[in-house]
Amino acid sequence: MKSLLVLSLMLSLSAWAGLKVGTYNIRNFDYDTREDIHTNKPELAQILLALKFDLIGVNEINNGEELASFIKSKMPSFQVMLTKCGGGNGQTLGFIYNTTKLRLIDFTEELGVTNPGGQPTCRANSRPMAVGTFENLSTKETFIAYQVHLKAGSNAEAYEIRFKQYEYLKNFFQNAEAEGKTSYIVMGDFNTTGYLDRDQDYKKFSAMLNANNLTNLTTSLGCSAYWWGGTDDNSEAPSKLDHIVVSRDYLTNKGASHRAQLHGHCKKVACKPASSEDLGVSYQEVSDHCPMTVEI
């Protein structure tokens, strides 16, 4: 009986100490001017609450004050922290986190990734990288979370810029590790448009991960977003743009066990080509992307 009680206590402590992290590009929250669509907030609330996350990185937040107000009303134990800069289109990024599980120690934004090799800038080019240092309140361990949103597009110019961003990130993380910042998570919209085709984009992205001993915890997930596919055939095509990767030390400290999950319309249609109607409200009125989570 005593051994069972000890085992039960160990399991409960393990469950408390573990974290569920995620990433979600919430397409131009809370109003997408390109599509003239206001974010369907009741649908978004259902999506976020169902994730049961402790920490989620978010992208394309055009109205940070509205997001903070929305989260406060729907998830009162959570807080929002976003970058001030959002690139040329004002798409800020950052984190939503559970204050009963995590304490935010420090938050900065890394502008160098906006224009690798050139002058970093806040209001043009790509988005910055959000950098949050968190403490797990149950274990007192600290880790760094990075949220990225790299250059979009599949043309040669977009690829060239994104390849420079991969190189920048490779050097950035190597320098960070040299400074002792070895336990970290990198997540977000890497915009790896060539990932499913296994083209040069996939190879450059993978090379960046390998150079830094980063493990992609979401390789088993078949997609993370949908787009029109280049033809007007009423069939939207899946793509794999978003990822959650971790450093070797973070994975070693937390244990190798993890479970990746895909959510939203991507899960609904199992990453197969589908019509906008089949993808449903989350695709039409919230985001083309789907949230993904990992329990570590």
What do the PLM-derived regions correspond to, one by one?
Residues 55, 60-142, 146-150:
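Structured beta-strand-rich core segments of catalytic domains in phosphoester-bond hydrolases
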Residues 27, 62, 101, 249-251:
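Acidic glycine-/aspartate-rich tracts in secreted/extracellular proteins
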